């Protein structure tokens, strides 16, 4: 073994060790902080902010004045969120926490981590959209956007796939009939409640909710992945046919430079970091399941665009390459989390992403971890947004680092090294719902 290789392995081992300590500290923070939080949408989730945002979309000039106080607070006084709304539980965050703890179980064999994962799955069973027959999830607040208001507990095809993945991961580790039934129900929801809109002979976009008109790229990518997976799990060819049309919509609407606009409506033509990751993650997962030939070329162009346009001069994720508006922050935890996820999925096919992965993970460990164990949420133009938000970065970063830790454990095992031990700082933590979570 040459010295360069030894040095590389040693450096990676040190990085993995630091990730282990950071994950341990985060779990202890989660136990003391609780499983509800404010959100980056807290400024607009309440009645005052919601009306101001709706006015902005109807009358830009007057509305700009109405939302100005919230935008000012977002940029300079992030803790003011508590004046506009209250902490909430977010299903999409619970799904990420469930997956993160499942990764820790896979890495260490520590059964308490699987118990932690199951705790969050139990919470997901409670938080499903109550007015729908099938299992599905959305936001716990009214979401005002340019097309109107999406009411709380309206299912979102950009949320439900995470719950699907969380239950599938647990089912593969511990097959339970109840989880299989939930997975079947989620697949039926994605296939029937979410609508298709023909865009070409071979492609269809899909609705974001059961009642909108479609056109959002990442929505189609999410649904294509979910139904492709479900077609394999349940042997349902109908799911695969629906998925293939949504997949073709994504492939047919990739720009010549390799990017994807957010939507094809001619209005939301921005290109940002985490939505680009969402699209390419879905493509990578579909390719792993099917070997679809067209995906390889799309990913090649996508990775080239991504690497050349969605990183700043320091080689770190930047929010937009084509922004829809002025942004009040320089970097975002969510972008970094999704970057880590994408690099882990694609580094074998695109080796240049290995250096990106190491750089971003190192940067998170050095600059974004707080003394209490949580992560900073945003790097503002002046200072930091240190308000911990489960839906907006905390859960995603926990999952991505746990995924990194699990993949590192697999690599170590392949090299014949001993299995990773349980994470340090073994303690018992209590969730905000008084349910015991062990960390040993």
Which residues does each PLM region occupy?
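Glycan-recognition and catalytic cores of secretory/periplasmic carbohydrate-active enzymes
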Residues: 1-440
